[in-house]
Amino acid sequence: MVKIQNYGTGRRKSSSARVFLRSGDGEITVNKRSLKDYFGRETSCMVVRQPLELVDMMNNFNIYITVKGGGVSGQAGAIRQGITRALIKYNHLLRSELRKSGFVTRDSRQVERKKVGFRKSRKRTQFSKR
């Protein structure tokens, strides 16, 4: 029996996610754990579910996700982009609706590196005139 699935890759900060959409009843599995167990925080779970709620397909797919790197927020954003790309492969007519909500575009913001002589990337020690 051949299983039909759609694949999407998502990236955010230093996280990357591989997302597989298969027809099912709405179960979301992240690194072999349920969505609630993996993230714990409801805000991250909401970010992951946003594209599905937008196109009203919450209970149409079982979603299998592997995600690596970064923290909780970056991983949630990477998964959201991966789900969006997989939905577009499933039905290209969803692209315009997803683009209007800003889910298709990769958020290219990265952490700015720390510079020599500074405490952080831009924070300096207090200036003393004398």
UniProtKB/Swiss-Prot annotation:
MF-aspect GO terms: RNA binding; structural constituent of ribosome
Superkingdom, natural source: Bacteria
**Basic residues bias (residue ranges):** 116-130
Give the start-end ranges of region Disordered.
Answer: 105-130
Q: Which Gene3D superfamilies match?
A: 3.30.230.10
Q: Which UniProt keywords apply?
A: Ribonucleoprotein, Ribosomal protein
Provide the Gene Ontology terms for cellular component: cytosolic small ribosomal subunit
Q: Show the Pfam families listed in the entry.
A: Ribosomal_S9 (PF00380)
Give the GO terms filed under biological process for this record. translation
Output compositional bias ranges, type Basic and acidic residues.
105-115
Q: Which HAMAP family does the record cross-reference, listed alphabetically?
A: Ribosomal_uS9_B
Its family remark reads: Belongs to the universal ribosomal protein uS9 family.
Q: What is this protein called?
A: Small ribosomal subunit protein uS9
